[in-house]
């Protein structure tokens, strides 16, 4: 968790430091603080089990995400930015672990920190959702049932290629649990890098 917090601080520093201001955005482009309203993103991550994992886990995290801009903070401080509400479809092959795959949905909010004239936009996000895993409760440490809840948290930096396209890199945390509906409930905590690309319109 300390590593995750440190990553958030680093990403905020990178995006707000003058040394990382990037190429100035021309007047013809859409304002960074008032971007186009809708956005679709494809993102991939590679997650590792941590924090009392019941077994050694390595998971490929694939996300198809729709976002809509919702609220802008007009401020001269480093908090200047805008919100996005998002819905993500999740597909995760489990390369190492007791189970084989996970499918789910996640709903949440993302906040983007922006500076005038910068193409770099630090962000952080969090959401809740539900999904299904091919559980194996007969195996010690296996998930107790197919239905699970999920929690996602992420922090990273987007780079604005043009008025429509952005690429991003960041860190992702995922928690899977059935909320105590089975006993035992060997939940999963997963951390790892994430990259993606998005299109705004």
Where are the regions that the model predicts?
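Short loop/turn motifs that connect adjacent beta-strands in outer-membrane beta-barrel proteins
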Residues: 22-37, 71-83, 97, 114-121, ...
């Amino acid at each position: 968790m300390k590593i995750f917090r440190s990553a958030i601080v680093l990403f905020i520093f990178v995006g707000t430091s003058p040394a990382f201001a990037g190429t100035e955005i021309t007047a013809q482009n859409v304002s960074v603080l008032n971007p186009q309203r809708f956005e679709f993103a494809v993102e991939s991550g590679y997650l590792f089990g941590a924090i009392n994992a019941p077994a050694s886990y390595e998971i490929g995290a694939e996300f198809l995400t729709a976002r809509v801009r919702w609220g802008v903070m007009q401020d001269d401080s480093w908090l200047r930015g805008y919100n996005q509400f998002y819905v993500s479809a999740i597909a995760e092959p489990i390369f190492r672990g007791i189970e084989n795959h996970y499918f789910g949905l996640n709903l949440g909010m993302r906040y983007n920190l922006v500076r005038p004239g910068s193409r770099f936009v630090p962000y952080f996000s969090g959401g809740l959702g539900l999904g299904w895993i091919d559980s194996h409760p007969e195996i010690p440490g296996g998930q107790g049932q197919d239905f699970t809840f999920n929690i996602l948290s992420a922090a990273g930096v987007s780079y604005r290629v043009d008025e429509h396209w952005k690429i991003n890199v960041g860190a992702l945390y995922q928690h899977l649990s059935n909320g105590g509906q089975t006993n035992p409930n060997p939940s999963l905590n997963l951390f790892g890098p994430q990259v993606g690309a998005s299109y705004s319109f």
